[in-house]
Amino acid sequence: MKIKHILFFVKSILIYSLLFCKSYMDSPYSCYKIEGIAGPEDFVYLEEGIFLVTSHNRRDLESLGEIYSYNPKTNQVQMIPRINEPENFSFRPHGIDYRKPYLYVILHGNTMDTKWHSVAIYEFKNNVLILKKNFQHELIVSPNDLITLSENEFYITNDMKHRASYFELFKTLFLGINYGSIAYCNMEKQFCQIVSDELGFPNSLAIVDRKLFVSTTLENKIYEFRIDKDNPAILTSKKEVAEIAGADNIIYYNEKLYITSHPSIMKFMQHSSNAEKYSPSLAYEIDPNTYKTVPIFEDSGKKISAASVIIKLNKELFIGQVFNPYLLRCTMG
């Protein structure tokens, strides 16, 4: 074992021990639950003023998931019908993106270490999701989230080389050896290419102008890449723009980046198998031009555990989570 890996191991043990013991405050905001959506891990906010929300009970991987709509004006939750799917379609949604009129959904198989993954493309029309395409590629090995460049192009994160590999997870957590990557895919050409690798559990993506932002959950960093103007399969000028422990989903809205985080990975892992074990959550607003990072939410886990996605609309926060069956809606200040 190299000296740098030994030093990283000792540092990691100290950091994770401190974070496990650290206490987090309960959110002071007035919040209430939007119930009835199992594991609302990711969402997109449409210009029509509604959310499309992924739903899957991740404590029961055999179960299938759904997509729900949520209207903040009426406070109404509605399951979205899906049509044109083949029989026994493995609809277990993860990260999503929306490029009108299409919803792009990462899907997985029914085990934690599944090798079956796809990107399903649905047309969202008359409040129905119509499956148009189901894209698979050998370089999509452990997908977490995606962001579209055009109707047929997207970037997608592979958080590991082998999904749910405890060996890779241990080496990333305690030795600083990273296995994650970002791939560029062109569905029209049936083409994918790895455009960045050796990332520590790359999670989510956002595009602002020609800049690609990526959160790395186990590196605790937000990176910015420049997208080559002539070839989107080339990323240049990798730069760290923020340090956020356990960063999860990124949403770009109203000229700001909104990012949730899991400051204690150990408590997150406990919560993944036991809903009674709280997993604290933090969230931030980042200016993509100046990189100014402002905390906007903190909770010990009493109001919401393992918060995975957040957006600020006026003076309200809307928050999703990985496991428990509700969104959280909070009024700030």
Locations of regions flagged by a protein language model:
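Beta-propeller blade signature
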Residues: 65-72, 117-124, 175-186, 278-288
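Short loop/turn segments that connect beta-strands within beta-propeller blades
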Residues: 71-75, 124-127, 186-189, 227-230, ...
